[in-house]
């Protein structure tokens, strides 16, 4: 039976493992909001199917689906993808799912952060969000694992860890007044250390340009292994992303991680720039959610990939830099197969493959 813990993971000897460590399964949520996904979410659903089926070749996948969409999802997904009915507000499993922590004996627990739709009442991307805020606890109940409920607003995409004491995040997101306005930077860092079980937090100033999540770190970089990250990059000094990536690069290459290692940074050239077309914008229902406008620049990034067991599930865009991204990642993951998925439809919704997935680490 799953129960709520009254301490913190760090006090109990738990920490957030690296995403490159072995998984038991991956969790996702089926898209259906017509005010975020164009044409009634049908194009996005096809891409989610491709992502889930690609991951399922390497590890188990569970897709959470509303009652209304259950039969549709079940018919479209491969039979080896488990489908479970669960109410939800949208499909960003990385941000609403539990952060899984483990201890030295291989036991796992979940961290249930407060979710407020990326800015709460001061600018959240949709309302209400109570169904999404309940997903982490429900997943822990399904898995029969204990969990920690925090009073701290955080989305899973706003943090990356190396599994060895170091956590990466951005000031643009975690210091945003729409997250935890009553906490100082030092208090926020202490929360990260307590609930992720880390020793050092590396703060990067900014995320990817025009990222509506206020600069989630998972769109800016990904962790290859302890002491090694890939970083979204452009050599175009006139591109607004250049200064953002340069600031991150300078900090990363002049900072030691929690174990005293110099951090190796592999530059991963960004796609595009990519912009929303008039046809794409007109396919999204207009209401009180975040609007999508023609010629709006999208926060496209190849760093927003999922590390499966022995594979990298990489978003591509039909862009001239797709092949370079594959080559770059194959060089840093020589023992992984690079599985590419055309992912523009996810990008149109505001994120990408890492944003719609959440790994569950293996237990001993």
Curated annotation (Swiss-Prot):
Query: What protein does this entry describe?
Result: Putative agmatine deiminase
GO molecular function terms noted in the UniProt entry: agmatine deiminase activity; protein-arginine deiminase activity
Q: Which GO terms describe its biological process?
A: putrescine biosynthetic process
Record-annotated active site: 355 (amidino-cysteine intermediate)
| EC number of the protein | 3.5.3.12
The family classification in the record reads: Belongs to the agmatine deiminase family.
Stored Gene3D superfamilies: L-arginine/glycine Amidinotransferase, Chain A (3.75.10.10)
Q: Which PANTHER family match?
A: AGMATINE DEIMINASE-RELATED
Q: Which Pfam families match?
A: PAD_porph
Methyltransferase as a keyword of this entry, yes or no, is no
Q: What top-tier enzyme class does this entry carry?
A: hydrolase
Superkingdom as given in the UniProt entry: Bacteria
The UniProt entry, under InterPro entries, shows: Agmatine_deiminase (IPR017754), Peptidyl-Arg-deiminase_porph (IPR007466)
Keywords from UniProt, A to Z, are:
Hydrolase
Q: Where are the annotated coiled coils located?
A: none
| Reactions that this protein is recorded to catalyse | agmatine + H2O = N-carbamoylputrescine + NH4(+)
Q: What is the lineage of its organism?
A: Bacteria, Bacillati, Mycoplasmatota, Mollicutes, Mycoplasmataceae
């Amino acid at each position: 039976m799953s129960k709520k813990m009254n301490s913190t993971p760090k006090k109990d000897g738990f920490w957030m493992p690296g995403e490159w460590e072995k998984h038991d399964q991956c969790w996702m949520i089926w898209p259906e909001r017509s005010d975020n996904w164009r044409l009634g979410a049908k194009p996005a659903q096809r891409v989610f199917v491709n992502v889930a089926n690609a991951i399922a070749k390497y590890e188990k996948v569970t897709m959470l689906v509303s009652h209304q969409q259950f039969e549709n999802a079940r018919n479209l997904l491969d039979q080896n993808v488990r489908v479970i009915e669960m109410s939800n507000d949208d499909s960003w499993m990385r941000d609403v799912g539990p952060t899984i922590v483990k201890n030295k004996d291989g036991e796992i627990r979940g961290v249930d952060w407060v979710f407020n739709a990326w800015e709460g009442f001061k600018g959240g991307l949709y309302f209400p969000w109570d169904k999404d805020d309940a997903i982490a606890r429900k997943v822990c109940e399904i898995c029969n694992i204990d969990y920690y409920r925090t009073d701290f607003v955080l989305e899973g995409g706003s943090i990356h860890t190396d599994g060895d004491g170091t956590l990466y995040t951005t000031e643009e997101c975690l210091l945003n007044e729409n997250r935890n306005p009553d906490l100082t930077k030092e208090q926020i860092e202490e929360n990260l250390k307590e609930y992720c079980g880390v020793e050092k937090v590396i703060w990067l100033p900014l995320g990817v340009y025009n990222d509506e999540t206020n600069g989630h770190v998972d769109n800016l970089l990904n962790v290859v292994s302890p002491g090694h990250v890939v970083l979204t990059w452009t050599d175009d000094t006139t591109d607004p992303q250049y200064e953002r990536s340069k600031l991150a690069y300078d900090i990363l290459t002049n900072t030691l991680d929690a174990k005293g290692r110099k951090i190796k940074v592999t530059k991963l050239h960004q796609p595009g720039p990519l912009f929303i077309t008039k046809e794409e914008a007109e396919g999204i229902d207009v209401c009180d959610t975040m609007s999508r406008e023609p010629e709006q620049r999208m926060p496209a990034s190849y760093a927003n990939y999922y590390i499966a067991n022995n594979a990298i599930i990489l978003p591509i865009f039909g862009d001239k830099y797709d092949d370079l991204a594959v080559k770059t990642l194959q060089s840093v993951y020589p023992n992984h197969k690079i599985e590419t998925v055309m992912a523009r439809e996810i990008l149109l919704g505001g994120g990408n493959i890492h944003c719609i997935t959440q790994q569950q680490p293996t237990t001993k």
